[in-house]
Each structure stands twice: as structure tokens, then as C-alpha cells.
């Protein structure tokens, strides 16, 4: 998923 990383889970927009 997109929100698997700590820094991504805060802003789940496009997969970072």
C-alpha cells in the first residue's frame, strides 16, 4: 500500500 511508511502514513496522498 501507499501508507506503509511512517512518513507516508501521515499524508496518504500519492504513494510516496
From Swiss-Prot:
Tissue-specificity statement: Expressed by the venom duct.
Primary site of residence: secreted
Keyword field: Amidation, Disulfide bond, Pyrrolidone carboxylic acid, Secreted, Toxin
PTM sites of type Pyrrolidone carboxylic acid (Glu): 1
GO cellular component terms, semicolon-separated: extracellular region
Entry annotated with the keyword Disulfide bond: yes
Cystine pairs: 2-16, 3-12, 8-15
Compartment list: Secreted
An example molecular function term from Gene Ontology annotations: toxin activity
Residues recorded with modification Cysteine amide: 16
Domain remarks in the Swiss-Prot or TrEMBL record: The cysteine framework is III (CC-C-C-CC).
Protein family: Belongs to the conotoxin M superfamily.
Protein name listed in UniProt: Conotoxin ar3g
